[in-house]
């Protein structure tokens, strides 16, 4: 069974992330969504909240297929975490050329450290190309409508985080 590792902060998961996950299930039988935990960062959502939002978003987007997806935390090198979970593929979403430049550097470094793990680039769909979790958080914090950019569960969670 081919297992893919999809690392990110997912703070919060966006429609772009969901798009990449749907594509990832076309190249791997199992996908591990890996939430990076960085002690120096203060995320909007806790690990537990992000994991639950991922599960709820995927249940909505992929009814009946969520058994092929698991959610874990990691705080070490991506390749080490992927190896720990038995993954042989790293999934990376690409929105534009800037993402490609950065991701090619990372893929090269990861390949040197872990030649047994291959990076797969999956292009974002047209509708999700402009979406970033950072922009979603900023727009939501200013009271903007982010419903076109995030799953319903995330929209509800963002709304509840916003002060009245």
Curated annotation (Swiss-Prot):
Cofactor(s) required, per the database record: Mg(2+)
Record field: catalytic activity: (R)-4'-phosphopantetheine + ATP + H(+) = 3'-dephospho-CoA + diphosphate
InterPro entries the UniProt entry points to: Cyt_trans-like, PPAT, Rossmann-like_a/b/a_fold
Lineage: superkingdom: Bacteria
Pathway membership, UniProt: Cofactor biosynthesis; coenzyme A biosynthesis; CoA from (R)-pantothenate: step 4/5
Binding site for substrate: 9, 41, 78, 92
GO cellular component: cytoplasm
EC number annotated for this UniProt entry: 2.7.7.3
Positions contributing to ATP binding: 9-10, 17, 93-95, 103, 128-134
Complexes and interactors: Homohexamer.
Recorded family membership: Belongs to the bacterial CoaD family.
Matching PANTHER family: PHOSPHOPANTETHEINE ADENYLYLTRANSFERASE
Function: Reversibly transfers an adenylyl group from ATP to 4'-phosphopantetheine, yielding dephospho-CoA (dPCoA) and pyrophosphate.
Designated name of the protein: Phosphopantetheine adenylyltransferase
Organism encoding this protein: Rhizobium johnstonii (strain DSM 114642 / LMG 32736 / 3841)
Lineage: Bacteria, Pseudomonadati, Pseudomonadota, Alphaproteobacteria, Hyphomicrobiales
């Amino acid at each position: 069974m081919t297992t893919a590792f999809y690392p990110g902060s997912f703070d919060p998961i966006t429609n772009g992330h969901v798009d990449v996950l749907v594509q990832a299930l076309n190249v791997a039988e199992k996908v591990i969504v890996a939430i990076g935990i960085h002690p120096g960062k203060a995320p909007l959502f806790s690990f537990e909240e992000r994991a639950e939002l991922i599960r709820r978003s995927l249940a909505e987007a992929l009814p009946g297929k969520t058994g092929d997806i698991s959610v874990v935390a990691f705080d070490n090198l991506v390749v080490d975490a992927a190896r720990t979970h038995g993954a042989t593929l790293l999934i990376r979403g690409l929105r534009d050329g800037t993402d490609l430049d950065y991701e090619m550097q990372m893929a090269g470094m990861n390949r040197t450290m872990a030649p047994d793990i291959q990076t797969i680039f999956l292009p974002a769909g047209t509708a999700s190309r402009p979406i970033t979790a950072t922009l979603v958080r900023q727009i939501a914090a200013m009271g903007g409508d982010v419903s076109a950019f995030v799953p319903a569960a995330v929209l509800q969670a963002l709304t509840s985080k916003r002060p009245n």
